[in-house]
Amino acid sequence: MARTLGPITALLLGVAFLLAGTGLQFTLLPLRATEEGFSTLAIGLMGSSYFVGFVGGCLFSPYLILRAGHIRAFAAMVAVATAAVLCHAIAIEPSTWAALRVLTGFCLAGLYLVIESWLNDRASNDNRGLVMSAYIVVNYGAVTTGQMLVTLYPRAGFEPFALAAILLALAIVPVVLTRSAQPAPITFVRFRPLHLYRAAPVALVGSFMIGMANGAFWGVGVVFALGSGLDATLAATFASVVVAAGALAQWPIGRMSDQVDRRVLLAMLLGGSIAAGLALGLLPATPTSLLMLGFAFGTLALPGYSLVAAHAYDKMPAGEAVETAAGVLLAYGAGSILGPVLASLTMAGVGPGGLFLFTAAAQGLLLAFVVHRARVQPPLPASAKTGFDLAATAPMGAVITTEPLDVTDPLVAVPDTAPAPQPDADPAPRQQDEPTR
């Protein structure tokens, strides 16, 4: 294991810093916004703005990377994301924060693309599963840790924003100092929803509706916790418990889905998450009950994306893996744009519990659709399924695939930039007439 992970340790360390800073922002910004008197709708719009930027980054950041190269593009996007964090502390105004979240979402999508392209390039058929699984474990672990860092400093001060900026800035150090050669293949996004729907309707509709429900939690989950009587520390703990529960459940649920109809298992998870959501939204709240129900909700709701992504891989041709991954991720992102706004409107009407009443409604609609599809279309035999892959079905980026990227694929490109110099190697002399890239 050490021999396999050693060459990518720098990348994983960069991921840990990057995602810790991101997780801190997901909790810090709703907490500070509530203390500043932002309306629930304004906070929901902030959550949606992040996913607007994320979808935009999925679509357009590949062109930035092709133009500048992996390391320079990575450095530029980290710099912009770091500046955006600090600007939150300077300009405390809802529309400004929403615009800054768009910038952050765009940069994070591009950073995912760079990191995952390197990991894909460094992984071989023998160690791909270990490399990608390590990446996902670091990802979830860093986000959960970052959420709890909000308890270190008073939210009213500059310190938590400075800490988030420091973490983001540190992410660049192990990456720019890595001896890994670039360039690595990157993927472009082609979104053909009708093509995906004809082959796997549950995958398209499921990723969109799950994006609505899960995006609502990411956007205003902390606001729900505060409105339910938790203090800032317990609100951060609540958010971390939900995410940690979802992370722990991903692999066992995914492996279970290899043995049964994924749609049936998804329906069972949806039924359980609806029950947990209704309990969170309607029952009297105590710290213990909220944490327990939050754990149940995370266990049942967050792995849903992995199931619909795996279902999409089952139904789509193997040669369209890149397009399939991008299509499911963009549908999830589109749902995540709507979710926080609609949930915040529900909360404004019925109170904090409206968040989970909204998630239950979205999941209920999806449950009805999944049951209908399971009745009209027979399940695939186990032998015809694509084995569940934790990394390829996580809602992180569209570039991770179960096989190495095919550079002849029209959706795959290699930046035309020189590789990073290797140790003890002299850089190639530049010709006088060579244009500066």
Predicted features and spans:
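Helix-to-loop junctions at the C-terminal end of transmembrane segments
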Residues: 57-70, 154, 249-261, 347-348
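Helix-breaking motifs and short loop linkers at transmembrane-helix boundaries and internal kinks
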Residues: 69, 90-95, 261, 283-285
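Structural signature of the two symmetry-related core transmembrane helices
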Residues: 72-87, 165, 264-279, 357-360
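C-terminal transmembrane helical hairpin of 12-TM major facilitator-type secondary transporters
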Residues: 263-306
